[in-house]
């Protein structure tokens, strides 16, 4: 007998539009959406999800803050107690955006995706203008002063897999007083990118191990946790003898 009468979690992709053009993008940002769900239909689906006792509805993009009614949608999720655990954005934060988020009553985590503070690196890897880094750092300070929960996430590629690049970003983050944590995650394959192109973006296992070992001594100097994504260097799959009974990964919950 199944324990649940409906899904535990739903995900709404509000838009596939974005403010960046990341070389490693994991989203389908090229498909032209001819008939997007209306906000009214989304509200109906949110009610259905609530009635089915869905525990959480995630919001993803593209950039969710580019959807014209993101505030209405998020506020409804908050009201029904099924808001996402975190919302991820690469958009430079403004005071108006923070005010809008606060007005929804959202108590989850705002995840800021920032891979470096070098304008040249960000322009090459994200396709942004030369002011992007400055705008992101200004937005981080506003976010730090806002009282909202937030964390930083960086995708590790051949553009930023260098000790000096990560150390400079860490130095900037160390000035923030309320940061929850910083996550450094090596890039993984994207189904929307040609593998022979994408493979050039991915740092090798040796590169990742080296830069993690180099930066680890600096992590004791900051007051917030820094989470190093070691799945690539410490993977268990394809390394196990004895079949599935000896597999060190998670058990199937079906």
Over which residues does each language-model region extend?
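Conserved alpha-helical substructure of the radical SAM core
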Residues: 1-108
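Radical SAM enzyme [4Fe-4S]-AdoMet core and its adjacent flexible, acidic
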Residues: 113-115, 119-253
């Amino acid at each position: 007998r199944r324990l649940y009468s409906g899904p535990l979690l739903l995900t709404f992709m509000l838009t596939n539009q974005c403010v960046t053009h990341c070389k490693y993008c994991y989203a389908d940002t090229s498909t032209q959406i001819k008939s997007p769900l209306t906000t009214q239909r989304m509200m109906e689906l949110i009610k259905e999800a609530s009635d089915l006792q869905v525990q959480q509805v995630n919001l993803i993009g593209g950039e969710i803050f580019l959807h014209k009614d993101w505030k209405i949608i998020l506020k409804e999720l908050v009201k029904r107690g099924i808001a996402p655990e975190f919302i991820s954005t690469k958009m430079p934060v403004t005071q108006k955006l923070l005010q809008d988020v606060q007005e929804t009553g959202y108590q989850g985590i705002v995840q800021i995706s920032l891979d470096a503070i070098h304008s040249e690196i960000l322009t090459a890897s994200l396709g942004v203008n030369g002011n992007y880094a400055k705008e992101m750092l200004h937005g981080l300070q506003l976010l730090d002063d806002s009282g909202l929960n937030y964390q930083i996430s960086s995708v590790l590629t051949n553009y930023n897999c260098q000790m000096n690049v990560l150390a400079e970003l860490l130095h900037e983050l160390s000035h923030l007083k309320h940061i929850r944590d910083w996550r450094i995650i090596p890039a993984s394959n994207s189904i929307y990118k040609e593998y022979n192109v994408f493979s050039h973006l991915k740092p090798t296992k040796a590169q990742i191990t080296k830069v993690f070992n180099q930066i680890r001594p600096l992590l004791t100097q900051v007051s917030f946790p820094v989470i190093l994504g070691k799945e690539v260097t410490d993977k268990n799959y394809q390394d196990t003898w004895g079949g599935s009974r000896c597999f060190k990964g998670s058990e199937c919950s079906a």
